[in-house]
């Protein structure tokens, strides 16, 4: 190392020591050749010797030749006295080329990685032209990248070639010397070329797989497009076929439908050929190991299934129309047969039957007619019913019965004539007389053969002459009385069957609508593909939005619908069908109770894209909220249909059970309605279910009446009635205030703020209040609290009073039974002592009552005491008679479970005597 300036040499030395990869063992210092520089170097090195004093020796060399003592000349360049051929500028050029090539390889790797990521993560479009365009663009980019890889490979090979030393005779020794220098660079370039080759191989493999997948994706979309088009066309033909479902009508209309069906069959053949081609194409894709193998097989099966349905439906429709045409043809031929028979009867004149030859000719004509009409006459109605039951409409059945009766009557007439003509041919004594059936036979015939604008003709035999008598229309009407009643009965059966059919058909539609809602909306809320269209807060609201609709669907689809279908030909089974499953209908109460919460969710999220997309897929004209209302509408529809069915089933088999079913459904509706009101009660501390069954509920106008004890000034100043909603339970009566929010988006269901609750064992009533016959009193305890209640009408008032009386009666009966058990446990002595004590109390109570009340109330008190004494025998009778006497006298009547008061006037309320509790008075009897 040569350096004129020692300090700079020292700095360079330190840098080399820090960056040298190995350990330093010896430092050689070459001094400058000029005198001054050598002198300065020696002085500077002397003063800075301590800086160079390291843990290794430092040798100061005087000349270049001294280097050969320490270093081989093959390791030194010519300027240092060595033989090593080295060009620093050439080394810099090669070094820059190597570094640039390495950077190019790195950038190429990044480009390939970026392109692969783009191919893997880019979402493909949903239309075929866009897919083809993307496939072309990616193929072009692939070829550009391939060209870049080829250019980089070529550059690396050129650089690798330049690093190799030419193999000449004069340069053999120098090549060996340079081999060690260029071997490291050559290995670097070779390693980079290997890396480029591996990247190219991996990229080609990736592109081959991606191109195959893209081609298969394009094939799948073309297959799916053909599939959807065929499905649409098949469904269109199925809809056209369904329009031919009504096989009734005239024979001309049936012919027209058969012609339309033939045209439809021709169109279907071409469509089925296309479907077969698409199915074969799908099988070919599956055989080529398509990545969507399961989907393609599923589509092929669906297309094959739809094709089979189309073929079977057309085949079944052809058979049905052919049978209908055959039926119409039979009816037409039977009518012609009847017409020919009528003409034959009408053309047989009396004077032609006076000889044997004429009689034989007439007999032959009759035999020919009967032989021709024999197939129609011998056609049994049961056979017709069995053969054409599916296509027989009520009109066709009526026509068939009419023609059948005509044929039977014609046969009867001709058989009688045959017998007469045969007798005439055997006897040659007296002239032939025309033989006709007796009037009794004509009366029993169901349908007359000859009709006239003025009346109908019947045949009679008067002595030896034959006459035609025209029966007036009035006589015909009188004679048709029994048949009209029969027609009335038949019409009731038709109406009953119509209602039953409506019940079954609407049940099928209802089940199908529930299925579409559960599948098209509820199930889609769990579909990850729809999460982007759904607000995050809506995803966990499925059970609130749909309630227990799935439970309702399973009940109707698995159980109730099949039970109703079994009643299609047996209307008497409808009642038991509802009664056996009335407990299952309680699930509707749960659904209705959840309905307010469901509507709140719907109002909040009704405009989100999820519901709109589901509605679009289902092709529903109505939004989801209309279908969420279907269970509520259905449970109210049952009682209407049962009413109609009961209306047409009077005095029929199963009408009693049908009435019970109707009552059960009405009770269910009332229970559901009551439960809806109960869940709207706010502020009640406790469990409302502990109050027993809700009997009634309704709104009333309420005034605070006079109370015993202190009265607040605000109660005295209240003239305007309070609006209260009363809930009557088995064990209590609850007072609430009805609240209805107003404004857009508010809940349309009312809520009830709890005010107070009275236990029924402390409640009493006064049935009549002067001033308005709609008012009555409800009071608590010893009239500590009194409310005057006004109903909307008298009927509502009487209904409430009746239910309250029933509750009080039941409590009185329970109390009586309890007292009786206690009395049975007492001894005779105890009974005697209690009896004496109670008699004393009774006399004392009567004395006090006499002093505090007027004489006009005494009789009422005695009647009440007597009623209490006999309550164990006939409790209901006592209460009923007391109620009736109160209604007749139009005086206030009071009822309580613990205390009884005599009749009173409003001005004498404070002076009313207080009677003993029932628990004490019941022991007097």
UniProtKB/Swiss-Prot annotation:
PROSITE patterns, A to Z: CRAL_TRIO (PS50191), DH_1 (PS00741), DH_2 (PS50010), PH_DOMAIN (PS50003)
Domain CRAL-TRIO: 1-88
Signal peptide (UniProt feature, chain positions): none
GO annotation terms (biological process): cellular response to leukemia inhibitory factor; dendrite development; intracellular signal transduction; negative regulation of axonogenesis; regulation of small GTPase mediated signal transduction
Cellular compartments annotated: Cytoplasm
Cellular component aspect of the GO annotation: cytoplasm; cytoskeleton; cytosol; membrane
Superkingdom of this protein's organism: Eukaryota
Ranges for domain PH: 687-809
Disease involvement: MCF2 and DBL represent two activated versions of the same proto-oncogene.
GO molecular function: guanyl-nucleotide exchange factor activity
Organism whose genome encodes this protein: Homo sapiens (Human)
Keywords, comma-separated and alphabetical: Cytoplasm, Guanine-nucleotide releasing factor, Membrane, Phosphoprotein, Proto-oncogene
Gene name as annotated: MCF2
Similarity annotation: Belongs to the MCF2 family.
Tissue: Isoform 1 is expressed only in brain. Isoform 3 is expressed in heart, kidney, spleen, liver and testis. Isoform 4 is expressed in brain, heart, kidney, testis, placenta, stomach and peripheral blood. The protein is detectable in brain, heart, kidney, intestine, muscle, lung and testis.
Sequence ranges of the Spectrin repeats: 221-322
InterPro entries given in the database record: CRAL-TRIO_dom (IPR001251), DBL_dom_sf (IPR035899), DH_dom (IPR000219), GDS_CDC24_CS (IPR001331), PH-like_dom_sf (IPR011993), PH_domain (IPR001849), RhoGEF_Guanine_NuclExch_SF (IPR051336), SOS1_NGEF_PH (IPR055251)
Residue ranges annotated for the DH domain, each copy included: 495-675
Gene3D superfamilies the record matches: 1.20.58.60, Dbl homology (DH) domain (1.20.900.10), Pleckstrin-homology domain (PH domain)/Phosphotyrosine-binding domain (PTB) (2.30.29.30)
Record note on modification: Phosphorylation by TNK2 enhances guanine nucleotide exchange factor (GEF) activity toward Rho family proteins.
Domain notes: The CRAL-TRIO domain is involved in interaction with inositol phospholipids. The DH domain is essential for transforming activity and directly catalyzes GDP-GTP exchange activity. It may interact with CCPG1.
Protein's name in the database: Proto-oncogene DBL
Self-association and partners: Interacts with an array of inositol phospholipids such as phosphatidylinositol 3-phosphate (PI3P), phosphatidylinositol 4-phosphate (PI4P) and phosphatidylinositol 5-phosphate (PI5P). May interact with CCPG1.
Biological function: Guanine nucleotide exchange factor (GEF) that modulates the Rho family of GTPases. Promotes the conversion of some member of the Rho family GTPase from the GDP-bound to the GTP-bound form. Isoform 1 exhibits no activity toward RHOA, RAC1 or CDC42. Isoform 2 exhibits decreased GEF activity toward CDC42. Isoform 3 exhibits a weak but significant activity toward RAC1 and CDC42. Isoform 4 exhibits significant activity toward RHOA and CDC42. The truncated DBL oncogene is active toward RHOA, RAC1 and CDC42.
């Amino acid at each position: 190392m040569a350096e004129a300036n020692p300090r700079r040499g020292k700095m360079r030395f330190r840098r080399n020591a820090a960056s040298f990869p190995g350990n330093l063992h010896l430092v050689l210092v070459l001094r400058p050749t000029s005198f001054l520089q050598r002198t300065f170097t020696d002085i500077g090195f002397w003063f800075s010797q301590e800086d160079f004093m390291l843990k290794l020796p430092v040798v100061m060399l005087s000349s270049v030749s001294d280097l050969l003592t320490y270093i081989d000349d093959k390791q030194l360049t010519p300027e240092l006295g060595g033989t090593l051929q080295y060009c620093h500028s050439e080394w810099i050029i090669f070094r820059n080329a190597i570094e640039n090539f390495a950077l190019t390889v790195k950038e190429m790797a990044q480009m390939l990685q970026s392109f692969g990521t783009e191919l893997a993560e880019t979402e493909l479009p949903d239309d075929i032209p866009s897919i083809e365009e993307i496939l072309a663009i990616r193929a072009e980019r692939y070829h550009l990248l391939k060209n870049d890889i080829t250019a980089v490979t070529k550059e690396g090979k050129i650089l690798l070639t330049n690093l190799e030393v030419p193999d000449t005779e004069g340069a053999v020794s120098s090549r060996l010397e340079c081999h060690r220098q260029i071997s490291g660079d050559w290995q670097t370039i070779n390693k980079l070329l290997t890396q480029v080759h591996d990247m190219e191989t991996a990229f080609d493999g990736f592109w081959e797989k991606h191109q195959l997948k893209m081609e298969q994706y394009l094939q799948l979309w073309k297959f799916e497009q053909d599939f959807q088009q065929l499905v649409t066309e098949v469904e269109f033909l199925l809809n056209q076929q369904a329009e031919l479902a009504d096989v009734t009508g005239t024979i001309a209309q049936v012919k027209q439908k058969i012609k339309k069906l033939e045209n439809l069959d021709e169109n279907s053949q071409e469509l089925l050929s296309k479907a077969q081609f698409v199915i074969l194409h799908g099988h070919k894709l599956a055989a080529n190991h398509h990545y969507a193998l399961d989907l393609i097989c599923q589509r092929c099966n669906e297309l094959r299934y739809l094709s089979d349905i189309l073929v079977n439906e057309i085949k079944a429709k052809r058979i049905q129309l052919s049978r209908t045409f055959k039926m119409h043809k039979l009816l037409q031929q039977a009518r012609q047969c009847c017409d020919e028979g009528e003409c034959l009867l009408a053309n047989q004149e009396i004077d032609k039957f006076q000889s044997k030859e004429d009689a034989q000719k007439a007999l032959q004509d009759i035999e020919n007619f009967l032989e021709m009409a024999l197939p129609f006459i011998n056609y049994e109605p049961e056979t017709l019913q069995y053969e054409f039951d599916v296509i027989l409409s009520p009109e066709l059945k009526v026509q068939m019965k009419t023609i059948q009766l005509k044929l039977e009557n014609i046969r009867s007439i001709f058989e009688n004539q045959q017998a007469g003509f045969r007798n005439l041919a055997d006897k040659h004594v007296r002239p032939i007389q025309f033989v006709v059936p007796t009037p009794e036979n004509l009366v029993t015939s169901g349908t007359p053969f000859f009709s006239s604008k003025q009346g109908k003709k019947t045949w009679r035999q008067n002595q030896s002459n034959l006459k035609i008598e025209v029966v007036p229309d009035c006589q015909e009407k009188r004679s048709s009385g029994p048949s009209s009643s029969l027609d009335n009965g038949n019409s009731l059966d038709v109406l009953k069957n119509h209602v039953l059919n409506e019940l079954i058909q609407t049940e099928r539609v209802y089940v199908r609508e529930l299925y579409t809602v559960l599948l098209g909306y509820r199930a889609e809320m769990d579909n990850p593909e729809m999460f982007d269209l759904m607000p995050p807060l809506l995803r966990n609201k499925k059970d609130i939005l749909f309630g227990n609709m799935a439970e309702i669907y399973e009940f109707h689809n698995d159980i109730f619908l099949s039970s109703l279908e079994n009643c299609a030909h047996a209307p008497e089974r409808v009642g038991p069908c509802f009664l056996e499953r009335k407990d299952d209908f309680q699930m509707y109460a749960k659904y209705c109770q959840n309905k307010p919460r469901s509507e709140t969710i719907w109002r909040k999220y009704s405009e989100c894209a999820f519901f709109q997309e589901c509605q679009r897929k289902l092709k529903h004209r109505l939004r989801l909220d209309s279908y969420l209302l279907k269970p509520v509408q259905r449970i109210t529809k049952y009682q209407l249909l049962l009413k109609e069915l009961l209306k047409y089933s009077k005095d029929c088999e199963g009408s009693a059970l049908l009435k019970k079913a109707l009552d059960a459904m009405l009770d269910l509706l009332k229970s559901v309605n009551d439960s809806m009101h109960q869940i709207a009660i706010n502020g009640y501390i406790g469990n409302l279910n502990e109050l027993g069954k809700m009997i009634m509920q309704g709104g009333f106008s309420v005034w605070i009446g006079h109370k015993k004890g202190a009265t607040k000034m605000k109660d005295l100043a209240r003239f305007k009635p309070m609006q209260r909603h009363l809930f009557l339970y088995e064990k209590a009566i609850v007072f609430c205030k009805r609240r209805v929010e107003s404004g857009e988006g508010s809940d349309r269901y009312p809520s009830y703020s709890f005010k107070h609750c009275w236990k029924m064992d402390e409640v009493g009533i006064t049935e009549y209040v002067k001033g308005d016959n709609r008012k009555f009193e409800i009071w608590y305890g010893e009239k500590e609290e009194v409310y005057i209640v006004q109903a909307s009408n008298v009927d509502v008032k009487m209904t409430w009073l009746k239910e309250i009386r029933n509750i009080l009666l039941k409590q009185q009966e329970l109390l009586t039974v309890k007292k009786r058990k206690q009395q049975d446990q007492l001894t005779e002595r105890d009974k005697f002592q209690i009896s004496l004590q109670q008699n004393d109390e009774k006399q004392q109570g009567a004395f006090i009552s006499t002093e505090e009340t007027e004489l006009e109330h005494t009789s009422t008190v005695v009647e009440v005491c007597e009623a209490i004494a006999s309550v164990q025998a006939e409790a209901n009778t006592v209460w009923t008679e007391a109620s009736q006497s109160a209604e007749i006298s139009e005086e206030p009547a009071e009822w309580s479970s613990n205390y009884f008061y005599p009749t009173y006037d409003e001005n004498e309320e404070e002076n009313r005597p207080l009677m003993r509790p029932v628990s004490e008075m019941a022991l007097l009897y």
